[in-house]
């Protein structure tokens, strides 16, 4: 890592957050293209620079973009530059790719330095996607409302550029970024993010979008922290927590004697914030009036501070007891588990009804069947079909693919409260595998299974690694083992979502 810092000479650039000198490094563009540059690329037209500064790199790119614009104005019908033989936006795309590498360097250094610290071992477990579900089990059962907000996307390029102003101090880098963005996107908006990623450098776009999102989150979390320190009573006069500083001070000075014995009634609100796939999720124990206020805080913050148009209909409020939250491939909701306790005092006995709130996590079976149908494993009704594109592969490869998909889904959805949906997914993949092999050998499913025997699909029924470990700890038929199989299991080695799970 020290050699990497010396190679990029970051000590001088990072001291004042000056990134502009790094733009003139040839190897920055080699890093941007993963050393996949060939001799036809303009970066290697001058190979004698080595590790020296070369202002000709960016200057040549800018000049060619300027010459290219003149050619475009004279030949708008051509999608290919007739002189240079490159696409219209190639040169600005090259600058954008190099800039994407440069702006990620400071954050990469911070991440590496943090991972080498004392907290590295502790933070490893929190990298797993499943690590958030034990937190939800502990917290969500005590909350009342959940607020889901679709994060609006910037409608103008300047909004994305301005997100970098607070930590990039040199104006030259921002001017160059702004110039390349406007030239490359031709003043197009970013209203539709998926379409924009397809026409723009994905690495730089995601960095700019995340920087913009983190900026609004920092302001929101500041408001949330301020409101959490503002202690309120149940009086309707003090429901506005954002502007509570003066009220609390006035309350403490004037009514201190009257409320001295009741100050313990003040309590902090329970607010938890999560961002996931373009959504902001806010769960709270507050009343419906306060959660509605947070809804309008979201909309006003986006519209008046970040100049983002957001309709109030894009922000939904639901009660956790009546709503299932679609989150990370699970449908999470709060369920009441009733229980009856028999109590006896002297000669009198009576029954006590007790309901305990628990987090219920279920598999969104309809969405996963839709993903399996899109991947040609089944039809829209969930009936297994053959996978014709895999029919040319060897039998062992076909079986290995299906088994790997089945085990990955089983591993990811091990935290489901109800295993019936998981068994249905396994059934679809199992018979899709059989139909694919029968199609390859030009046979029927029944004849194919009769020929090979029932042990042919034993790969789908064999124990997973986790089940094997549990079977070593608990004896066969032990009650605790059956309870573990039926219960939820969260693993700390899942760092990405399966494509079939990521249905949205």
UniProtKB/Swiss-Prot annotation:
It comes from the Eukaryota. One of its GO terms (cellular component) is chloroplast. It comes from Gossypium schwendimanii. InterPro entries: Domain_X (IPR024937), Maturase_MatK (IPR002866), Maturase_MatK_N (IPR024942). It is found in: Plastid, Chloroplast. It holds the Pfam family Intron_maturas2. Belongs to the intron maturase 2 family. MatK subfamily. The keyword Transmembrane does not apply. Usually encoded in the trnK tRNA gene intron. Probably assists in splicing its own and other chloroplast group II introns. Disulfide bonds: none annotated. This is Maturase K. GO terms for biological process: mRNA processing; RNA splicing; tRNA processing. Keywords: Chloroplast, mRNA processing, Plastid, RNA-binding, tRNA processing. The keyword ATP-binding does not apply. GO terms for molecular function: RNA binding.
């Amino acid at each position: 890592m020290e050699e990497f810092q010396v190679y990029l000479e970051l000590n001088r650039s990072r001291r004042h957050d000056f990134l502009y000198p790094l733009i003139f490094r040839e190897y920055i563009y080699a890093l941007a293209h993963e050393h996949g540059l060939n001799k036809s690329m303009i970066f290697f037209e001058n190979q004698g620079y080595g590790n020296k500064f070369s202002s000709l790199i960016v200057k040549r790119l800018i000049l060619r973009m300027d010459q290219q614009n003149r050619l475009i104005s004279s030949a708008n019908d051509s999608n290919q530059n007739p002189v240079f033989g490159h696409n219209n936006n190639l040169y600005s795309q090259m600058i954008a790719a190099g800039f994407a590498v440069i702006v990620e360097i400071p954050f990469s250094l911070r991440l590496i330095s943090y991972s080498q610290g004392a907290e590295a071992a502790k933070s490893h477990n929190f990298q797993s996607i499943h690590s958030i579900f034990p937190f939800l089990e502990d917290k969500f059962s005590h909350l009342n409302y959940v607020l889901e907000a679709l994060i609006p996307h910037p409608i103008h390029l300047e909004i994305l550029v301005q997100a970098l102003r607070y930590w990039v101090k040199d104006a030259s880098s921002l001017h160059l970024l702004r110039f390349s963005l406007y030239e490359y996107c031709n003043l197009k908006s970013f209203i539709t993010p998926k379409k924009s990623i397809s026409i723009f450098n994905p690495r730089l776009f995601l960095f700019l979008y995340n920087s913009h999102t983190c900026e609004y989150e920092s302001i929101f979390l500041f408001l949330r922290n301020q409101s959490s320190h503002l202690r309120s009573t149940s009086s309707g006069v003090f429901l506005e927590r954002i502007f509570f500083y003066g009220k609390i001070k006035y309350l403490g000075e004037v009514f201190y004697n009257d409320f001295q014995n009741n100050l313990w009634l003040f309590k902090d609100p329970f607010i938890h914030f999560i961002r996931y796939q373009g959504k902001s999720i806010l769960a709270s124990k507050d009343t419906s009036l306060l959660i509605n206020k947070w809804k309008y805080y979201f909309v006003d913050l986006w519209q008046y501070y970040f100049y983002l148009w957001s309709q109030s209909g894009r922000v939904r409020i639901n009660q956790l007891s009546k709503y299932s939250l679609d989150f990370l491939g699970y449908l999470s909701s709060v369920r009441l588990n009733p229980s009856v306790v028999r109590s006896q005092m002297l000669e009198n006995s009576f029954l006590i009804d007790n309901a305990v709130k628990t987090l219920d996590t279920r598999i969104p079976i309809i969405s996963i069947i839709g993903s399996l149908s899109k991947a040609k494993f089944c039809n829209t009704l969930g009936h297994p079909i053959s996978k014709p594109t895999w029919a040319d592969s060897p039998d062992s490869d076909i079986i290995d693919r299906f088994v790997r998909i089945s085990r990955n889904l089983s591993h990811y959805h091990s935290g489901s409260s109800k295993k019936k949906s998981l068994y249905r997914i396994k059934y679809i993949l199992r018979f899709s595998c059989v139909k694919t092999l029968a199609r390859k050998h030009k046979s029927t499913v029944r004849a194919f299974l009769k020929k090979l025997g029932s042990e042919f699909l034993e790969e789908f029924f064999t124990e997973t690694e986790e089940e094997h470990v549990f079977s070593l700890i608990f004896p066969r038929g032990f009650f605790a083992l059956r309870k573990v199989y039926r219960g939820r299991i969260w693993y700390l080695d899942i760092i990405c979502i399966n494509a079939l799970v990521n249905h949205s």
